[in-house]
Amino acid sequence: KNKFQIRNIILENNWKKVFKKKINLIILAVPPKLQEKIIKYNFRYKKKIIFEKPISQQYTKSEKIVKLLKEKKIKSEINLTYLNHDLFNKLKLLILRKKLGRVKRYSVVWSFKGIDFNNRIKTWKTDEKQGGGIKNIFLTHVFSYCEFLFGSNRIIKSKIKYSKFKGLKYKKFISSDVNNPDNIYGKISVFNKKTGFQNHKISIWFEKGYIKLFTKSKDWTKDFILKIHSKNKITTIKSKNKFK
């Protein structure tokens, strides 16, 4: 059978048929190669669409797709999860309102457990040319929320460690030093680990204090804690795991 109905959910094995139905919003969670095809197919239907990053396997192709989406006035959004996270938005307000003064510097350390890489499985997720790898899957999240919090950045220098398997040259560790026009210096480290929960920590040093936003969890986005260190006071806020 081509489709199975469970209450109000219809599972369709031909994605093109979905566009012919009375659906207002399409949400994609597919590999970049297929995602590019689906987004282009939607040019004729112009349905609102939410997609993952990277948009396609190549940066130039992704740029062209974004340009066409704007020209065709198709409502679209890339799923940059952290920009909609309750505590990331709380942190942005604290920075904008200068509750602890001006930001002096910050660091990001994100260690994660890559299942495909650790098991030496050759998939698009371990192949940077197919839109996978640390740079495309993880580092893009970090750069996007750093721009959201601190403004546009430029990379000063980077350090990369590689691991080779099944003909792939996999970046298992990336460290980047960044700076922005306001002279806010940042150090970003993203790397694969073999065991344990993923560990994601953002540390920010201000003129009048220090803030740490962190989680140690199986889930990328859940159980974050915001700790605000001001003069003689520490305030702790736990995430409600809510998104805009």
Give the ranges of each region predicted by the language model:
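N-terminal Rossmann-like dinucleotide-binding module
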Residues: 1-6
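Beta-loop-alpha module in the N-terminal Rossmann-like domain of NAD(P)-dependent dehydrogenases
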Residues: 9-68
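Hydrophobic residues in well-ordered beta-strands that form the structural core
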Residues: 51-52, 76-78, 213
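Short strand-turn motif at the edge of the Rossmann-like AdoMet-binding core
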Residues: 53-54, 79-82, 110
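Rossmann-fold dehydrogenase core element
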Residues: 64-82, 102-106
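C-terminal glycine/acidic-rich active-site capping loop/insertion
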Residues: 81, 201-244
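Predominantly a Rossmann-like dinucleotide-binding segment in NAD(P)-dependent oxidoreductases
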Residues: 84-158, 164-167
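Contiguous beta-strand/loop segments that form the cofactor/metal-binding neighborhood of enzyme cores
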Residues: 137-221
